[in-house]
Amino acid sequence: MNVRDDPTGYALVVDSTGERHTIGRKLVIGRESAEIAVDDLEVSRRHATIRPLDDGGLELYDLDSANGTFVNDLRLGSQPLRLEAGDVIRVGRSALRVERLTSAAEREHLPTVIRRKDEIQ
């Protein structure tokens, strides 16, 4: 999906690859076949789900992953969590950052943020 087509104005940046995923529909975070694939053996095949809300926000769910899902170093429980720009999602040893895209120009020219878990603690 092109960043310009994103209705929510949010993107998720994967630290290990620098890939930016716009969040225009429900996406699964996990290994290999997931929409947001993370190359990390501590990540479950279907680890977590991120989805846009009708009010323009985002929500994150853990999918009963073996090692848990963390947001800003706090473990996500069984209830979904509303995300904000700047939140850092950690699955396994990998971090993903929530980015807010505020205008069409920014959507086209936003730099890619790449960070490892040890860089954000």
Predicted ranges, named:
Residues L12-V13, L63:
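Hydrophobic beta-strand positions
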Residues E19-R93:
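Forkhead-associated
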Residues M1-Y10, S94-Q121:
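Regulatory inter-domain linker segments that are low-complexity and enriched
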Residues M1-D5, Y10, T17-H21, S78-Q79:
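Short linear motifs in intrinsically disordered
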Residues T17-G18, D55, A105, R115:
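Polar/charged alpha-helical tracts
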